[in-house]
Amino acid sequence: KKVLETATIPATGSSHTNSYGVYVGMTYTAGNLIYQITSIDTATVGQSKVIGVVAAKKNKIKKVTITDRADCKGYRLNVTTIGNNAFAGCKALEKLTIGNKVTVIGKNAFKNCSKLETVVIGKAVKTISSKAFIGDNKIKKITFKGDKLKTVKKNAFSKKAKKNIKSKKTKLKGNKKAIKLFKKKLKIK
């Protein structure tokens, strides 16, 4: 397994191995995705972030569903963050579904996923970081499942992608409050 990013470990949580044999900073693979544990909140629940895709699948994976939870050694971990550069350069990726516990989409998270067409943003997403979808000019549909969205960096999408949204080549669906804020942050009328 290759760690694609160094995590910032929160002050909360345990820094030692718990009874499940998991610890903050530990990386693990579930399916085609690589995760890193960011906190251990209780005896049975913690948090993790997606930090990448298994190297052998990076240029082959067409569909990614980031689930609400990814278990490691029987320990339940809520997936709350998509790490910086996690899926950058996944050239075959066409469809992305972000789970309902994810709150942050990191910098460059889906940069240069040149075939990406469909994005479903989960209920809890609050932040879409800088260049999160830069270079993804073929997006045809973005669906917002919730109304928690607060921050969309103005350079989260490329100029071409913004132009497609403005001209309605890219359809925006779902929660009206999230769509309104999304368009406002990207300065799209």
Describe each PLM feature range.
Residues 1-12, 32, 39-44, 58-81, ...:
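Structural signature of tandem-repeat unit edges
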Residues 1, 20-21:
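Conserved "repeat-terminator" motif of extracellular CCP/Sushi domains
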Residues 12-19:
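Extracellular interaction modules
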Residues 56, 86-87:
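Acidic, Ser/Thr
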Residues 83-86, 106-109, 129-132, 155-156:
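Consensus positions within tandem repeat domains that build extended binding/scaffold surfaces
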Residues 19-20, 30, 88-92, 111-112, ...:
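Glycine/tyrosine- and acidic-biased, solvent-exposed loop/turn segments at the edges of beta-strands
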Residues 21-57:
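Short beta-strand/loop segment at the start of cytosolic alpha/beta domains
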